[in-house]
Structure formats: structure tokens, C-alpha cells
Regions:
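A short Gly-Trp-Pro
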Residues: 1-142
């Protein structure tokens, strides 16, 4: 599959998003911070590294020693989850119409999902597996 340019926007339309997506995939995170930030799980799209461009009133919140979250300064829409160390940005699937037609491929903190389950045969990582992948130095959640 060839790379596709995807475009989207926040709820009020003041923040626009553009990215390149070579391998369409959607991910879900059920960690405490994502659930607090979104009132549910956080659904993100797997995009090509460094390809996310956001224009408009973007605000960020440093949610932990190694992570930050982006949101629209006007309407509050969740824009991305990011890791501070490498500057990676994982955009909210909801910014893009039909989540850019990406299929759910991976769940993080699947063992912490509160009373719901996502259907499918995608990979489901536990909290321990997720922390080992993203925060091996600290062992800290989110």
C-alpha cells in the first residue's frame, strides 16, 4: 500500500491536522491517564514518524515525566498523545473522518479496560508489557 496524506480537524475546526500514513492502523489505550483525558479510551492512528503537522491554537499538557498530551485551546478536543524523549506524536483517530479508514491493530493497557472489551483479533498488551515498551527506564505509568 502506498503512503496516503490524511487531513482532519478538531471539533471547532480551529486546529487542522495533516499526516502521512503508510500502514493504516489504529491503536487504543486504556491507561488511567488516557481514560481521564478522554473520558474513555484514547484511540490513535499510526502515522509515519515525524509527519504530523498541526496548525491552530494547540496547547500541551505534560501528563508525566515522559509523556504529554495535545489539545485544542479553543474547544478542548484531544489532538495527540506524545512521548517527550523522542518527540513522537500519536494523533487522535477522531481528528480524521472515519479514522482514516484504519483498522484497530493494538490495545495498550488492555488489562485495565473498565467493563468493556473491543472486538477483534488484534494484539492486546497488558500494563506491564506497555510500560516495558515505552518507559523501560522509569517503570512509571503513562
Amino acid at each position: 500500500m502506498s503512503a496516503a496524506q490524511i487531513e482532519g480537524h478538531c471539533l471547532c475546526g480551529e486546529v487542522t491536522a495533516r499526516a502521512i500514513m503508510s500502514k493504516p492502523m489504529m491503536r487504543a489505550c486504556h491507561c488511567d491517564m488516557c481514560r481521564s483525558h478522554t473520558s474513555s479510551m484514547f484511540m490513535s492512528l499510526g502515522i509515519d514518524e515525524g509527519s504530523l503537522s498541526l496548525e491552530g491554537p494547540v496547547k500541551t499538557y505534560r501528563s508525566s515525566e515522559w509523556a504529554e498530551r495535545g489539545f485544542c485551546g479553543t474547544c478542548g478536543s484531544t489532538l495527540f498523545y506524545g512521548t517527550v524523549k523522542d518527540g513522537a506524536r500519536h494523533p487522535s483517530a477522531g481528528l480524521f473522518e472515519n479514522a482514516a479508514n484504519a483498522d484497530l491493530k493494538l490495545e495498550f493497557f488492555a488489562d485495565q479496560a473498565p467493563g468493556y472489551a473491543l472486538a477483534g483479533t488484534h494484539r492486546k498488551m497488558t500494563a506491564k508489557e506497555t510500560i516495558a515498551l515505552f518507559a523501560p527506564e522509569t517503570g512509571e505509568d503513562q
